[in-house]
Amino acid sequence: MDIKQVTETIAMIEEQNFDVRTITMGISLLDCIDSDIDKAAEKVYNKIVSKAKNLVAVGDEIAAELGIPIVNKRVSVTPISIIGAATDATDYVPFARALDRAAKEIGINFIGGFSALVQKGYQKGDEILIDSIPRALAETDFVCSSVNIGSTKTGINMTAVRDMGRIIKEASEADPMGPGKLVVFANAVEDNPFMAGAFHGVGEADVVINVGVSGPGVVQRAVEKVPGESFDVLAETVKKTAFKITRVGQLVGQMASERLGVEFGIVDLSLAPTPAVGDSVARVLEAMGLEVVGTHGTTAALALLNDQVKKGGIMACNQVGGLSGAFIPVSEDEGMIAAVQSGHINLEKLEAMTAICSVGLDMIAIPADTPDTTIAAMIADEAAIGVINQKTTAVRIIPYGKEGDMLELGGLLGYAPVMKVNKASSADFIARGGQIPAPVHSFKN
């Protein structure tokens, strides 16, 4: 490594907010299944604590050794609806409490996996888990929840979509911050290291380490160095920068897996912003030549960014996965917040951007009086984009206050202006229930 690369790396960390956003340990709970919910919850607690007891210490040790901040240490587990189905319990809050207790014991930031996979229908544990979500989120500090309601192979479970509109409203009434820890997915992935949507898929190894990196500031600085250049030059610049960022993630993941004695899973190539100035995906798009994110050309700029991040990242790492794209959460991105406040971006433009980006309508505050059927319809729209385009899409929206208010979430979650929502009703559409069939191009066999 020559001296130029060394100084580049130092600048990435000190000036451009580069960090490893998360080391997430995925833990299978299939061997914790028990017909007695209290015994099962205790087994869950014990397994998480035994497997992840050194996660925080190892993360801090690697950060100190490399001089690279590792912001979060997290755990994801097998979807709890699967574990709970063996019990006769009618409420899975005891599992949520066990997860929360384990998270506090080992000192992690979040624990994901209070989840259900219902893309083609409900099984015994699924409805119980979904109905438990509002209380589970209100009565815990670190538990995150997700529900997969559709996939390209199966279509969209519109009964589950309808139910999740209601659950998001109930979660916000139980705790205003609750919906910030709840994601509704189409095409959810099994190896996602990012919260709140992480869960440990049943096809994964018993314990794995997945890494998520963050480098919008680094990409922004690189883009600013090629003003007026052609898109060919711009694309190459983004790709090379993504390579450098991902290489660090690969190194951290390998070191963590070796020291913890578990398998290395994937590096998620997503660019994850924070509310800090200089750590914004929106500002990267503006550096490409847009006056404000949200104007015409925004979706094209995001497409270039997303694709080149993938291309650079794939070269840098032998195992990539997770969501792998650019995140555009409103509350967690200083540039997105500014664009909403200035009126340059609305829900409809955000929805268009989600056809390109890594997730979907993410960390968006909407008026508290928004009907649950309208929330369900937003979920249906996002799911349709994901299912038809064979990509992951998601909704993480927070009903709060009235249009124009400011929702303060604090920390990495930032703050969100309450956005305008179309007032026309979708109630009769959502009331139908049932399944939207899989698209014709899903039949690959």
Curated annotation (Swiss-Prot):
InterPro entries: UPF0210. It comes from the Bacteria. Homodimer. Belongs to the UPF0210 family. PANTHER family: UPF0210 PROTEIN MJ1665, UPF0210 PROTEIN SPR0218. This is UPF0210 protein STER_0157. It comes from Streptococcus thermophilus (strain ATCC BAA-491 / LMD-9).
